[in-house]
Amino acid sequence: MDLGEKINTVERLVIDASRVSRYLGYPRKVPIWKLEFNLPKTCYIFRENNNSDIAIDIENMMGFAIVPALSEKEAHNRLKTLIPSIYIKDKIERL
């Protein structure tokens, strides 16, 4: 099993999304969701092709993610595959 990359969530970490153009094109536009979350001091991130379109910003064990997904539940599940140890702290917002 791949352990992913260990990150220190106290320091600032910004990961930009890639491959976003496939979600923004006509005829079907995928909704974009903003999720705010808390993290432990150190955790693992599992960046792969199927979640490289997720952007995250982390600092002081808190952060937010911008996730393209068809539903709120799918957005939550996609973020959990990227960072399994997250705790969603607020309502998920559709942008």
Language-model regions: role of each:
Residues 2-23, 64, 72, 76-95:
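Short, mixed-charge low-complexity intrinsically disordered segments
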Residues 36-38, 59, 70, 93:
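A structural detector for beta-sheet-dominated domains
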Residues 43, 54, 86-87:
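Short glycine-aromatic motifs
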Residues 49-50, 54-73:
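A short, exposed loop/beta-hairpin motif centered on an aromatic-Gly-Thr core
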Residues 2-50:
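Short N-terminal "domain-start" leader segments
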Residues 33-35, 45, 67-69, 75, ...:
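Hydrophobic beta-strand residues in large extracellular and virion-surface proteins
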